[in-house]
């Protein structure tokens, strides 16, 4: 087994990233051994298609104003991070601020430190591309993620309702800077 390689995502990674994102979302938020959020199927499936379809991932990778990184071992994707212009609904948010959009680690790779490594890369990139604070939206029940972000200087700055179809997840808005 080779070491884990962390690198920028490429367009040809889109299909594998879409599969990893979908699997990680379902394992984390929907599965009985995850948070088991009872999303109605009518809300969940369109959200999954919109968020984790290969074409949507290709568009995000191609965005000039965003950064996208992945961790892989032996050609198998284990984790990824995506950052770009802030889109969180906070009154202090300004054009030029940056947001960590996603930080996903496959269930089989948790505990390897990949989330922390990808977060550090994303934060360096965000700092270099931001004219103001850095932002993260995190589900209110995901205490593990909140603890990781707090260890990197993020503090709760607000709350909002994140739409998954008509369903709403209660999210915290975190800010650093």
Regions found by a protein language model. Name each.
Residues 2-5:
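Extreme N-terminal starter segment of soluble prokaryotic enzymes
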Residues 8-14, 18-108, 119-125, 129, ...:
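Acetyl-CoA-dependent GNAT
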Residues 19, 77, 111-113, 135, ...:
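Short glycine/serine/threonine-biased micro-segments
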Residues 94-98, 132-177:
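C-terminal "cap" of GNAT-fold acetyltransferases
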Residues 102-120, 129, 140-147, 151-152:
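Conserved glycine-rich acetyl-CoA-binding loop
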